[in-house]
């Protein structure tokens, strides 16, 4: 999901923002020039910023691709400098598999996943120090976090002076030729990307083309990763429900072209040996998931009622009415099939039709929920949600951290340029060549494992819609999967973390008491699910070898809806300067703007905020805790805050 587009800069004193926020000079990086193309290079630096386990290495860096019209089959007259953060596995990295991690957006940084969900460390509330995450996904797997497409996070096209408004949550290109303006609580300065919407991928398919070229360079020429295990997996989240299927199927198609000698260019013939696609709370296809946006706020396992049955029914009628959401989605897809068959998004007529479908579906589906003032990413939380806390933004603003990373740009966890580019062509309304559910089917037929994992408190990409996707696939195992029942996910001797339907290589899991970013809410459960899938074990128990038992299927109930949940207490409010629009009250925003707010470690201490009201419920829905002995992480976990202006088209 989308976060505030804040640029992280230094704020070292309480109640002021006087320090200049530009990154320090880049020093001490290793430069590796490609043996295939003199204009391609990798720059990187080893550090222990987050992973502090003795003997476990980690590296930050960029893969630099020059402007080149031939790279992607589309006009690419801009440099691509793609950021990565690589963590070796804590156990046996030489023989461990590797997983790529991608957040969604479109335009969200994968640092969200690293620091808020499954990376080696949590950021403490001082925004300066870290705590080891014992449930890190790099315990047994090499992890590669990538900021993509171009201009996302630490990735950039050209270094550009910028200002950031904490009040309006916007980045603007700045001219500092007459001097750098003084910083204050509401206006910060830094170095970022050009902010040009055309200087990045403009749709999911073009992003797939771009990331494949990154992978060709990184896996062949990054000198610090020479494993015995060449398996590669992709795990992703949210808008990654589109990224993951599209990217993985594109990788698989390119593998086939390399094998049959359709691709013969030197430096582009590395087989990416795909093993697993994992999607967490994925927004995959509106045709399957649209109705869940009407149903979930009214009918969920927490007894929360964001609106009435009459409102729910009206939304569904709007979706199905002539010239409604479904009609416009169909028109977009037909227009794209005829007018943009190669998915370049360079046909203005098709772009306009699909952008209208994208916008209208947002309107039908999202506006009724906005009135409830509930969290998009956690329906049990208020809209101004301090959980997960966004302390990683301040952490990544430290000059010492930027220096250790070797980054020439400040951190921005959301790219306005990418968001504008994708939404301008109506990317969320479009499919790719097979459609994203078709991609999943293709991967399953190709022997790739696919796991759909959904937290049951998320609204924006909720589990009801995810379940519909899982049941709507058309592949050789469709009927066997549908006949499989739901089994308990046994996390430890005292805790059941969710329910899973699995047949062979395909699974759908509902994770209890988790919002959008499942690993941040339920780190132990998420790690068990992740490792069981990665190492070919059944998700329910982790005891059966699925590689040796391809006909394995879970047994149990047909539905999970009978398992109800208790509403958790509302989190204590925390107004965080670098997520002000998503965590602060109007009074606090006014204090930030006029400079009267008292700030300590980016947290607004005065004026203070009062705790929000609990969500509305209905007495007709029984509630019961799904199990005892919850393995939820209590602290310190770094998570996200959302924007009150979020719409369906923005995802993490």
Swiss-Prot record:
Residues 630-652 form a propeptide. The active site is at residues 238, 458, 516. The keyword 4Fe-4S does not apply. Residues 608-628 are annotated as: Disordered. A lipid is attached at residue 629 (GPI-anchor amidated glycine). PROSITE patterns: CARBOXYPEPT_SER_SER. This is Carboxypeptidase S1 homolog A. The lineage of its organism: Eukaryota, Fungi, Dikarya, Ascomycota, Pezizomycotina.
